[in-house]
């Protein structure tokens, strides 16, 4: 269930960071810092560099986001 007003964009994982954080390059060229959503963490979904993902951005801070889906 997406939050009200969240912006969903696609991107690619550039590098993993500590504490389940990742640097993601969006399709439009911007780089954001993103963490894994709770459901993905709960189901042990692994994310590796170069994976394609969907990131949910808050309209208040476009430099941080939450990874909500990993493409197969």
From Swiss-Prot:
One cellular component term from this protein's GO annotations in UniProt: cytosol
Main subcellular location: cytoplasm
The keyword Cytoplasm is assigned to this record: yes
A GO molecular-function annotation: ribosome binding
InterPro entries the UniProt entry points to: NA-bd_OB-fold, RNA-binding_domain_S1_IF1, S1_domain, TIF_IF1
SUPFAM superfamilies reported in the protein's UniProt record: Nucleic acid-binding proteins
Localization in the cell: Cytoplasm
Annotated keywords: Cytoplasm, Initiation factor, Protein biosynthesis, RNA-binding, rRNA-binding
Residue ranges of every copy of the S1-like domain listed in the record: 1-72
TM annotation in the entry: none
Role: One of the essential components for the initiation of protein synthesis. Stabilizes the binding of IF-2 and IF-3 on the 30S subunit to which N-formylmethionyl-tRNA(fMet) subsequently binds. Helps modulate mRNA selection, yielding the 30S pre-initiation complex (PIC). Upon addition of the 50S ribosomal subunit IF-1, IF-2 and IF-3 are released leaving the mature 70S translation initiation complex.
PANTHER family assigned to the protein according to its UniProt record, in alphabetical order: TRANSLATION INITIATION FACTOR IF-1, CHLOROPLASTIC
Quaternary structure note: Component of the 30S ribosomal translation pre-initiation complex which assembles on the 30S ribosome in the order IF-2 and IF-3, IF-1 and N-formylmethionyl-tRNA(fMet); mRNA recruitment can occur at any time during PIC assembly.
Family: Belongs to the IF-1 family.
This protein's name: Translation initiation factor IF-1
Organism: Corynebacterium diphtheriae (strain ATCC 700971 / NCTC 13129 / Biotype gravis)
Taxonomic lineage from the root: Bacteria, Bacillati, Actinomycetota, Actinomycetes, Mycobacteriales
């Amino acid at each position: 269930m997406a939050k009200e007003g969240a912006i969903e964009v696609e991107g690619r994982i550039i590098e993993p960071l500590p504490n389940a954080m990742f640097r993601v390059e969006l399709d439009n060229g911007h780089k954001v810092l993103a963490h894994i959503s709770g459901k993905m963490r709960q189901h042990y979904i692994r994310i590796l560099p170069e994976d394609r993902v969907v990131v949910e951005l808050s309209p208040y801070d476009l430099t941080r986001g939450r990874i909500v889906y990993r493409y197969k």
